[in-house]
Amino acid sequence: MKFKQDFFTQLPEFYSQVYPQGITKPEWLAWSDDAAQLIGLSQPTDELLLGLSGNTAVDGATYYAQVYSGHQFGGYTPRLGDGRSIILGEAIGPNGVWDVALKGGGPTPYSRRGDGRAVMRSAVREFLVSEALHHLHVPTTRALAVIGSDLPVWRESQETAAITVRLARSHIRFGHFEFFCHSERGRADKLIQLLNFTITQHYPHLSCDAAGYKAWFLQVVQDTAKMIAHWQAVGFAHGVMNTDNMSILGDSFDFGPFAFLDTFQEDFICNHSDPEGRYAFGQQPGVGLWNLQRLAQALTPVIPSDDLIAILNQYQEALVQPYLRLMRAKLGLSAVDVPSVEQDKQDLDLIGRFTVLMEKNQLDYTQTWRQLGKLDPTSKHSALRDDFIDVSQFDTWYQAYQLRLGAVADIPAWQTERNSVNPKYILRNYLAQEAIIAVEEGNLAPLHLLQKILTQPFAEHADHEDLAKRPPDWGQGLIMSCSS
């Protein structure tokens, strides 16, 4: 790997230098060839294993943990920071630059009495969801590898430590800006320094002046809205949408007790630590706006409040348009050449009525969409009909759907197109859990198979139909904790 160290050299007050503590008996548990290509790597090697497990130095790496703050479950925490993630620097790849971080690399000045470690189960889950989201075309950070060990760590019980090697276009979060506005009061100079760095590194087409700052914030609003639109379309619940877990670039970031929907449930909660459902699936669009409002508050020393409010008022449209584009594709509806408020309203109503029917009839979200690939949209009798208990309500919806759909000249091509946008496979929590149990027993094959399937989620994989099934009774509605 070839590194540059722009964050390290230009923002010395934004981090603490800290070196990883190696894990014992490191081994490759998983590796992403796809992610490796981003930073110019090919195959995992013994030398790389020692470096990324923290046992030897990686040439060109500087090692540091960033400081930031954030709103967690609605309350402001003035000092957070990378408690168990150590960044090596910015790796220069053939087509871009990626931060390389060791998540679980050991304690840092921001560990808050924690051990700085990640357990194997959380490392495997982060790796798998990074692969899954990327191949579902959802903006996300990536994971290069999972490195296991025999190092014992204690959570609710004794587990083993592991490291996720994360790749991110940037590790700058909403919380970085909050820290230098609220926690370090009177440091508007640092806020401006961070803002200028972010624009120069990631938005080079913008200027570092008043006009550029406003254009940048609008881009952040649009990118955040687009990310959440993707989440809602694929049925992904993040689970911990604190502002310190929000990437400034609109990439899905910091995965903990996430889940993909099994049975469609608007108020689905995937986080055991969120009993009131602040971060429930259906709340995510609203939380996205709330988090952007917190970012806007932090930017008031730099951008006038009236301008910030005007930009925030564009969030809803920035969310709805990509959501409509994604959902129209899932349904096979023709794109709208000329934007129409009335057509958008009608399509949102059609989509909403369909998901309400899914919830009322307790249907699997992913499987129901996939069934469209078997549908003859010109037939009066839908193959979907038998899945619904209330067939009269379905018939009413289906008639409206056919009317909006219009004529379909090539039915096989239409069906193929539906299968290209409606995945057959998602990372169901029970599948991740089965892979984790197998790893604990020394069997990596289920993990590697699941990774392979998740990199081709739209393919049939006829030999692995079992991985597309609804969860068994024990796997229904698995809720994870933040313990990792």
From Swiss-Prot:
Q: Which cofactor does it need?
A: Mg(2+); Mn(2+)
**Catalytic activity, per the record?**
L-seryl-[protein] + ATP = 3-O-(5'-adenylyl)-L-seryl-[protein] + diphosphate; L-threonyl-[protein] + ATP = 3-O-(5'-adenylyl)-L-threonyl-[protein] + diphosphate; L-tyrosyl-[protein] + ATP = O-(5'-adenylyl)-L-tyrosyl-[protein] + diphosphate; L-histidyl-[protein] + UTP = N(tele)-(5'-uridylyl)-L-histidyl-[protein] + diphosphate
Q: Which UniProt keywords apply?
A: ATP-binding, Magnesium, Manganese, Metal-binding, Nucleotide-binding, Nucleotidyltransferase, Transferase
Q: Cite the InterPro entries for this sequence.
A: SelO
Q: Could you say which EC number(s) this protein's record lists?
A: 2.7.7.-, 2.7.7.108
Q: Where is the active site?
A: 244 (proton acceptor)
Residues reported to bind ATP: 81, 83-84, 103, 115-116, 166, 173, 254
What GO MF terms are annotated?
AMPylase activity; ATP binding; magnesium ion binding
- Give binding positions for Mg(2+): 245, 254
Extent of the signal sequence = none
Q: What family does the entry list?
A: Belongs to the SELO family.
Q: What does this protein do?
A: Nucleotidyltransferase involved in the post-translational modification of proteins. It can catalyze the addition of adenosine monophosphate (AMP) or uridine monophosphate (UMP) to a protein, resulting in modifications known as AMPylation and UMPylation.
Alphabetical list of HAMAP family matching this protein: YdiU_SelO
PANTHER family hit by this protein: PROTEIN ADENYLYLTRANSFERASE SELO, MITOCHONDRIAL
The name of this protein is Protein nucleotidyltransferase YdiU
Q: Which organism is it from?
A: Shewanella baltica (strain OS195)
State the encoding gene. Answer: ydiU
